[in-house]
Amino acid sequence: MAIILGVDPGSRITGYGVIQCQGRQQIYLGSGCIRTSSDELPIRLKQIFEGLTEIIRQYQPEQFAIERVFMAKNADSALKLGQARGAAIVAATFADLPVAEYSATQIKSAVVGTGRAQKAQVQHMIQQLFKLPAAPQADAADALGVALCHYHTHQSLVAMGGRASSRTYGRYR
């Protein structure tokens, strides 16, 4: 049994999703968004760190997975996203959690079956997979997708006789 915290980082909105995995069963524990309130980036990064630290304290995950940075057209946006990822990763490492990272294409493939899925498709599949009464917010759905991707990748490695702690499955380097 493992509890996985998935994170979809953003400098304004950071989504999180927590699932518990038992064998082939994935159980929804919680999800939501950390919305930062300040225009000053250092304050927003602090809010992301503190928000995820509280989520980690509340759910006690054993594994942490985060979406990789994608190439943005705007360099300033890419830098801010990278800094938000850094705040999230520091929160995980402070809790001694192993950190894994996955591309958006890997995450969408794990959830929807195609790496080119739209956000609405990811939200719909997350709602169906976890039998939720309504689709979660886009950032929370993406974060749940990150957690599912991590679980499926972990299960595939174990099934192939690999080590679940292998650095080859998207571990942060």
From Swiss-Prot:
Alphabetic keyword roster: Cytoplasm, DNA damage, DNA recombination, DNA repair, DNA-binding, Endonuclease, Hydrolase, Magnesium, Metal-binding, Nuclease
EC number: 3.1.21.10
GO biological process, one term: DNA repair
Disulfide-bonded cysteines: none
SUPFAM superfamilies: Ribonuclease H-like (SSF53098)
Cofactors: Mg(2+)
Function: The RuvA-RuvB-RuvC complex processes Holliday junction (HJ) DNA during genetic recombination and DNA repair. Endonuclease that resolves HJ intermediates. Cleaves cruciform DNA by making single-stranded nicks across the HJ at symmetrical positions within the homologous arms, yielding a 5'-phosphate and a 3'-hydroxyl group; requires a central core of homology in the junction. The consensus cleavage sequence is 5'-(A/T)TT(C/G)-3'. Cleavage occurs on the 3'-side of the TT dinucleotide at the point of strand exchange.
Protein name: Crossover junction endodeoxyribonuclease RuvC
Taxonomic path: Bacteria, Pseudomonadati, Pseudomonadota, Gammaproteobacteria, Alteromonadales
Name of the gene encoding the protein in the UniProt record: ruvC
